Amino acid sequence: MNLFLSRFTGLRNTSFLGHARPFMFPRRYAHSLVAHNIGHIKLDPNEGLFFVDNLVNTPTYFYIQRYTALLFQNNLKKQLSAAFPSSDTMQLEDIIFRWQDGGAFLKVRYKEFPQDTEAVSEHVRESFRKRPVRTILHPFSTPIPHMVHGIPWLQDLYIFPSRTVDVNFEGPPLSQERLYSIFRTYGKLRSVTINSPTSATLSFSSLRSATSALNCMHGFVYGKTEFHMRYRHMNRFVAFKDWLFSHPRFTIPLVAAAITVLTASLFDPIRKFFVETNIVHGQKLRNINVVGWVKKKTRDIVLSPFHENGTNIKAPIWTTREKDCEQLKEWLDEALHSFIVVQGPRGSGKRDLVDRVVKERKNVLFFDCDRLFSTTNTEMFVSTLASQTGYFPLFSFLNNISSLIDMAAQGLIGQKTGIVSSSEGQVRQILNTTQTVLRSLALREHKEADTSVLDESEFLEVHADRLPVVILDNFQLRKLSNPMQRVVAEWAGNLVKEGIAHVLMLTPDVGGTKSLEQYVNGWENRTLLLGDADPVLAQRYVIESLPEEMQTEELRKELRVQLPKIGGRLRDLDYVARRLRVNSSSVSEAIGGIVSQNASDILQTFLRPASLTSEEKPTFTPEESWTLITYLSQHEYIPYHMLMLDPLFKGHDDAVRALEESELITITTVNARPDKVYAGKPVYVTAFRQLVNDPVLSANMQLVRCNALIGMANNAIKNDEQELQMLKDLGNLESGVKDRAHYLTTRIQKNQGVITDNEKSIERLTEALKKID
């Protein structure tokens, strides 16, 4: 649209700018044509200006363009001079670069100032289209010249261009339509907002449109209204923050993804390093001389003042188990697809055997399952698992924070962020990281050597003897119902199935290894069973663990008589040898001490009623424990089905299973069916007899059993009486109802007989207790 524009040929009275000092870059506009005290270009009546936009990128916060543009200033001048259509009526006088706005002013001298400014402007643009200006500072943009209708203000304040321009009016207000028609020629407008009769806000879709409009129209007078324009200052950080908060559906998942990427890129390599260090150097640390010396000295202080025979300790037992060691070594050199399970009761030497076998292995990872699965608190489990694998750092406190963030996001945007890290998720993350490290260790030589003929799986198959070894000590098969234990078993199964590690499971449970086959695709486990030493070997073990001066014939005879009382459990034999060496005790005193200690432990653990303040109530009662103790003090074992006929155990076996888990008893199986019940340890048999032979304890426990049986009979009678009352309320009794009533009456009589018999026993036991001093 052809606008009737008025042009100002002289400088306005701008004395209010006369004392302004540049805030930064003090010699930015060192040009003879610029009046630096007011920031305006000096123009004669027959001179005019063109503004060429987009010569360089619009400056950012650091204003790098100012320095880079100086390198190309001469080249730009040549291109601009060549593109301008100089003629007899119009000559290019000078070029004033305006780096702050990304363009330049062209000062033009006319022979006679033109009346049709639109025609002149189009003529100049056509010339620039034919000879476009190209610059490496803005290679994908074509600069366009615009005729300047106002009086541009070349300030050097620390103000950067913005797409939003504020326009202040001096004179009558203008309508939104009129402002749109004036400024649309410089580019697309997003909005035109009238703020007040003296101001408006123009929002352009591009930055080049805003810079062109401001440099061409500042100081322009439309009718009687003069424009004063400035960029609206935009705090980009605040704007970005506002945008983030106003688009939570986008930003919250983006933040979650950023956290995930940061964790993966920053912390995962650190964690892998610590896990690898634990696997590679954990075994070596136990073999360091200083550590070994401290362990040896500590053990010797406890075991014996005699050090010269330390190397002979445990020699007899390992002579007989040499075949077991060779078998384990052979399995560890093979490419197995199943677990290696070492079974044996606690104290049978499973860990010592495995330590001897893996002593020369480079990469060994050890888990103490007793400590790992002893807690029901998942956070404690995660912490223990991280400690045993070497996983560090562990940010367990972030679980609660991420849960709160997820809840807040669901309430705010209606969907979850996906950043919640549960304890189960952390467990899997720890195990996955450990698995990755084990795989890299298993394939390390494959990467270092020229093994192009073998792929990774073939390499692992061929070099199975170099695979890392994972040891799960005290892994209880009967507790596979524990979800965390199942997760660890599944992870161990993956190690075996992928062939990246050998997995040894040391378990005190006898039998039950079939349950592990589900984790290795049904492959049968390699099982090694360790038992107690026979009497001859047990005697040799104790004898050869003593100094030579103590190995007398009298001692051998005494051991031959006394050792059968405690059996051949390796831990108990160590205790006897320690008592003989350190305390110079007799054999009978040493054996008596270990029996008394076990009897005291049984009394405190199984024969005392549960404390009222105890958080975890045992599922067995003292009378149930005493019943088993009494039976096993008289017999080597109890048939499981016979035990279930006892009134205290009849109808449920929870108590028996609980006593097995507490290691008071051991249950053997036949075809997955409970078969026989044995004492938990050989020494327990002697301890049971000692407890049963205590007249006061025996009488008190029999009283407890009698009272328990009376209570059970009373409850049964009460239930039968209630049913009889219901039958009586029916009125006329049919024959079937009469039979039921007769049955209930018979049961009541039978239970009453039980009560009578037990009350007589109570009287007898009470009288017996009175006679004991």
Swiss-Prot record:
Domain RRM: 163-234
Keyword set includes Membrane: yes
Transmembrane segments: 250-270
All ranges on the Mitochondrial matrix side of the membrane: 30-249
Role summary: Plays a role in maintaining the mitochondrial genome and in controlling the mtDNA escape. Involved in the regulation of mtDNA nucleotide structure and number. May have a dispensable role in early maturation of pre-rRNA.
Family statement: Belongs to the YME2 family.
Protein's UniProt name: Mitochondrial escape protein 2
Organism per entry: Schizosaccharomyces pombe (strain 972 / ATCC 24843)
Gene that encodes the chain: yme2
